[in-house]
Amino acid sequence: MENSSLLLTALFNPDHLIIFSKMLLAMVLGSVIGLERELKRKPVGVKTCAIIAVTTCVLTIVSIQAAEHYAQVSENIRTDPMRLAAQVISGIGFLGAGVILHKKNDAISGLTTAAIIWASAGIGIAAGAGFVFDAVIATVMILVSIRLSPLVQRWVHRKSQRRRTKFNILVNDAESIGKVTQLLVNNQYRIEHIQVKDQSSGEVRLQIRCFSIDSTMLKDAYALLKAEDGVISVEVDN
């Protein structure tokens, strides 16, 4: 009975309740981040992120309390209260490196999962140090970033896949290259890419890719190029 009462007294000690609440917060926030990875069937899920967050949280608490304890024992002892936390950040990198894969086609995968591991450690440290608001806001922002990134990527991809207009132009000689490109630039055509190929007959073939233009501008561009001295033929692919 005495042991049980001592245990209950220790559990309901205000200081111990604060420690428990910090570790519980770290576990919850780590699990929330890990759940996103779990739903995507990634190797790092709820359990891993929760373990990382709780462990870094308790190490941070120990680091801070140890610094305070030994400072009271002797005035000659001074330690950095966040020393253990700093070592955790360094060591967690090795765990993150284990999930990064370099495939045969030079593609690299696992970077987001590695970042999640590092983020879980950071949130655990924040919770352990008592920065509750920071830990919660960081978790929310991480989840929002993960959810929004596919939408942003699709939007950027659509923008990058805008239609292009390709001109395949055959000119008499190299001097006509500058005339043709300058003609397009002067008429507000945005050139994206130019490729020059010498022909066996001494002529030069230009392949010019411009950002997509409407049908009216396309007709004008075709007419301008056909009328230019030195231009033998013009092909347009829109």
From Swiss-Prot:
<comment type="similarity">
    <text>Belongs to the MgtC/SapB family.</text>
</comment>
<protein>
    <recommendedName>
        <fullName>Uncharacterized protein HI_0647</fullName>
    </recommendedName>
</protein>
<feature type="transmembrane region" description="Helical">
    <location>
        <begin position="16"/>
        <end position="36"/>
    </location>
</feature>
<keyword id="KW-0997">Cell inner membrane</keyword>
<keyword id="KW-0812">Transmembrane</keyword>
<dbReference type="InterPro" id="IPR003416">
    <property type="entry name" value="MgtC/SapB/SrpB/YhiD_fam"/>
</dbReference>
<feature type="transmembrane region" description="Helical">
    <location>
        <begin position="123"/>
        <end position="143"/>
    </location>
</feature>
<dbReference type="GO" id="GO:0005886">
    <property type="term" value="C:plasma membrane"/>
</dbReference>
<keyword id="KW-1133">Transmembrane helix</keyword>
<dbReference type="InterPro" id="IPR045865">
    <property type="entry name" value="ACT-like_dom_sf"/>
</dbReference>
<dbReference type="Pfam" id="PF02308">
    <property type="entry name" value="MgtC"/>
</dbReference>
<keyword id="KW-0472">Membrane</keyword>
<keyword id="KW-1003">Cell membrane</keyword>
<dbReference type="InterPro" id="IPR049177">
    <property type="entry name" value="MgtC_SapB_SrpB_YhiD_N"/>
</dbReference>
<feature type="transmembrane region" description="Helical">
    <location>
        <begin position="44"/>
        <end position="64"/>
    </location>
</feature>
<feature type="transmembrane region" description="Helical">
    <location>
        <begin position="81"/>
        <end position="101"/>
    </location>
</feature>
